[in-house]
Amino acid sequence: MRILIRNTWILLLGLLLAIGVSARTRHGNDVVFVSELPPEARHTLQLIRQGGPFPYEKDGVVFGNYERLLPKQNRGYYREFTVKTPGVRNRGARRIVTGGELNSPRELYYTEDHYASFRRIQE
């Protein structure tokens, strides 16, 4: 009986810790510094700042934030840009999502798992 109670408490503690981690990443509170990004992401940032040209037709389209992982904003606030993935023939899973003005965004987010999680890019 004691083992069952102990295991239940361990399980509950694990769930609480997992929920805490999820809440931190939900609104992009996890941070990645530009210097920590893969070189392809740094190149995409450079293209965003200079206004292109972008290698993919869908770069710069409105990102709907349907996953609701980023802070809520009006439609059109967020835009997405592809980060090339070496060895992948399609667009891959990596993206930079910007918020605000197209060429001078106020917010930058990086996802390497196709919108399952985001990290805010810190200059």
Language model segments and positions:
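Bacterial N-terminal signal peptides
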Residues: 3-20
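Small/flexible residues
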Residues: 4, 8, 26-28, 97
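Residue-level detector of functional hotspots within protein domains
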Residues: 7, 18, 34, 39-42, ...
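N-terminal secretory signal peptides
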Residues: 23-72
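Functional cores of ribonucleases/endoribonucleases
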Residues: 55-123
